[in-house]
Amino acid sequence: MQSDVSNAEEIVKNVGNTPLVRLNKLFEQKEIYAKIEWCNPSGSVKARPASWMLNEGEKDGNLVRDKTTVIEPTSGNTGVALSHFAKSLGYKIELAVPERMSDETKDILKTNG
């Protein structure tokens, strides 16, 4: 059985592996496709930049699992993705959110860590 960290790494590796959908009703004369980013593992359209930031931070040695606390000011999607991946990979995360943030988004962030 794989470790939790190994499973988390597999989740992060799947970021960007999202479906393409042809928009044939909107553009009948041209082949136009949309990439469905909300199908990323975190459910956030900001999964790519969030996973990139964590990956680059680890490569540079600025982030160390189980030692580093990630701090992010967020108003939504980036925080959702960062909290999902950071928690999965063993980072503590603290988020600064605006008062006007929806209760639903606050609940997602609390659930993620």
Where in the sequence are the language-model features?
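PLP-dependent amino-acid enzyme catalytic core
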Residues: M1-G113
